[in-house]
């Protein structure tokens, strides 16, 4: 991206202040992005489109049209931003973990950035209960976004666990080594079009808030602010378009030919 595009991107996510090459700045950039740009699967669910991972296309979608996307889109564009800001950054494949569930394939894109002579895991494209900021790739506990995580460097990979009331829960692991952008193309295609893809079958829109979240699951909207939870259902495409515009800043047309 050129300087004008970088400035537009930073304006889109509401980021201001100095760009210091340290973990704190990475943390602030991640928070600015995830609290502004929705995680969403609308192109896949509504239109059956395989999202483009071309940086120019992503810039148009995210910055100009003020849309969101899923991990391959979000982290591809954010990776470009970090590199252009002077943070050496590469994409890596991540295996997401869920307690009691069968083993998932490697199907998530995360980022590893360098700053202060250290490696940091960065992720603006995880719609689940992952870290909402940088995780230093080291052994031990770290507080990220008010949540305690634990990192473990293993022989072949790096494991991230999340602390809960019931103990430690394995969240994800990955090998901190670069994966070429072209290698994410088949993963993107698979996640977009395989018949049981949750992104294809479900309408998903999430946005992180300072003290809560907004989430749309199919036709059910949930707003969480502190201890307050507000829920409602949308019944028509028109209501859905209004909700997407008002709650997520997404202005799209919902197809009328599909069963709603």
Feature-to-residue mapping (PLM):
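Secondary-structure boundary elements
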Residues: 1-66
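His-Asp-centered catalytic microenvironments across diverse enzyme cores
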Residues: 3-13, 17, 35-38, 46, ...
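Short glycine-/small-residue-rich flexible loop motifs, especially phosphate/cofactor-binding loops
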Residues: 7, 79, 241-242
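Residues at alpha-helix termini
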Residues: 12, 84, 246-247
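Cysteine-centered nucleophilic/redox motifs
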Residues: 67-93, 111, 205
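Generic C-terminus detector
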Residues: 235-260
């Amino acid at each position: 991206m050129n300087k004008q595009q970088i400035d537009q991107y930073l304006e889109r996510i509401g980021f201001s202040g100095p760009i210091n090459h340290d973990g704190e700045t990475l943390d602030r950039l991640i928070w600015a992005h995830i609290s502004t740009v929705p995680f969403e699967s609308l192109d896949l669910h509504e239109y059956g489109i395989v999202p483009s991972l071309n940086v120019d296309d992503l810039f148009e979608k995210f910055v100009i049209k003020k849309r969101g996307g899923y991990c391959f889109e979000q982290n591809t564009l954010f990776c470009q931003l970090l590199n252009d800001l002077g943070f050496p950054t590469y994409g890596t494949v991540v295996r997401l973990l869920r307690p009691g569930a069968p083993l998932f394939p490697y199907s998530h894109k995360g980022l590893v950035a360098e700053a202060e002579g250290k490696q940091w895991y960065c992720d603006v494209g995880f719609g689940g209960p992952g870290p909402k900021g940088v995780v230093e790739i080291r052994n031990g506990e770290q507080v990220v976004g008010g949540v305690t995580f634990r990192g473990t460097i293993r022989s072949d990979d790096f494991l991230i666990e999340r602390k809960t009331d019931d103990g430690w829960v394995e969240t994800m692991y990955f090998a901190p080594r670069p994966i070429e952008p072209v290698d994410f193309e088949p993963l993107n295609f698979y996640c977009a079009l395989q018949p049981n893809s949750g992104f294809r079958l479900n309408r998903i829109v999430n946005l992180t808030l300072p003290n809560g979240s907004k989430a749309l699951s199919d036709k059910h909207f949930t707003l969480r602010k502190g201890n307050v939870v507000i829920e409602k259902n949308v019944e028509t495409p028109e209501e859905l378009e209004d909700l997407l515009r008002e709650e997520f800043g997404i202005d799209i047309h919902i197809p009328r030919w599909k069963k709603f």
